[in-house]
Structures are given as C-alpha cells and as structure tokens.
C-alpha cells in the first residue's frame, strides 16, 4: 500500500476513534450528571435509561476486577493500532471498523480511569432472556465488529478488492 493511502486510512481511523470517544464520553457525562445511579427513566416502552456502574467486564462479569479489563484493553488497543499501521494489505473498511472498535474501547477505559467504573445506561425492554444494560461505547464496538465479521464470512477477496477502496 502506498504511503499516501496508508496516511489517508490512518486519518480515517483516528478521526473515527476521536469522534466515537468524544461522543461516548459526552453522553456518559450527561447520564452521570442527570440520572441518579440505580435510577430508571422510561424513554419509550422499548428503551429505558437505567444508570448503573459496571465495576467488572463484559455483561458485568468479574465485578471489582475492572482494572484487569482496563490493562487488557489498553494492550489490545495498542496492538490494533500497530497492526493497522504496519500491516501492508489492509482495506479501508478495516480502518473504519477498527476505528469504531478502538473508539468504543478507549471510551470504556477512560470511564474506568475517570469514574472507577463504566457508566452503563441503555436498557432494552421486552426482549426474552435479555437483562443487560450497556452504553454507547459498547454500541460503537458492535458497529465496528459486524462489518468485519460480514466481510470475512460473506465476501470473497475479489469482491472486497473490487468494491472497497484501499
């Protein structure tokens, strides 16, 4: 890949990371400032805002061990960034997808450092066997993961090469 393309793609990556990080932090700050902890506000019959603190990891596992997830996440974010810079054949959609993943992950790490826990608040109702509360950073991680999974399973390299610019 030419250096100009690499630089352009890294700019996409950095822009998305910073945008996701800023938006997620602003929304988390708003939740923390306006909704008391362990309080629910019904936005609609499907979506409630329930302010909780996650001191553990994904789905609240390993409560009180959030620092382990912060350390692991920092290592992963550094690894992904290095992978994007040093790997010779990465497509633009990968830079964009990883931008959402890294931005969301960085936001959750920043929550742990600023608040001592992750601020979760999106509470989906009326879904059987679903009782998890999550945040915008988690949503952004999924926004990044799903295109990576889709293209890796359902698109051939020829389709990706012909339809998506480097």
What are these regions (language model features)?
Residues 1-166:
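Alpha-helical transmembrane bundles and membrane-interface segments of multipass inner-membrane proteins
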């Amino acid at each position: 890949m030419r250096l100009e393309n690499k630089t352009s793609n890294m700019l996409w990556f950095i822009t998305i990371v910073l945008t996701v990080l800023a938006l997620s932090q602003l929304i988390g700050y708003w939740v923390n400032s306006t909704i008391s902890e362990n309080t629910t506000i019904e936005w609609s019959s499907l979506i409630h805002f329930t302010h909780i603190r996650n001191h553990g990891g994904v789905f609240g596992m390993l409560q009180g061990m959030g620092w382990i997830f912060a350390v692991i996440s920092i290592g992963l974010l550094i690894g992904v960034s290095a992978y994007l810079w040093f790997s010779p054949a990465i497509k633009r959609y990968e830079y964009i997808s990883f931008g959402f993943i890294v931005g969301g992950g960085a936001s959750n790490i920043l929550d742990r450092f600023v608040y001592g826990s992750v601020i979760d608040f999106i509470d989906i109702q009326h879904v059987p066997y679903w009782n998890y509360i999550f945040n915008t950073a988690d949503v952004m991680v999924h926004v990044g993961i799903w295109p990576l999974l889709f293209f890796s399973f359902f698109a051939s390299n020829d389709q990706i090469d012909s339809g998506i610019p480097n």
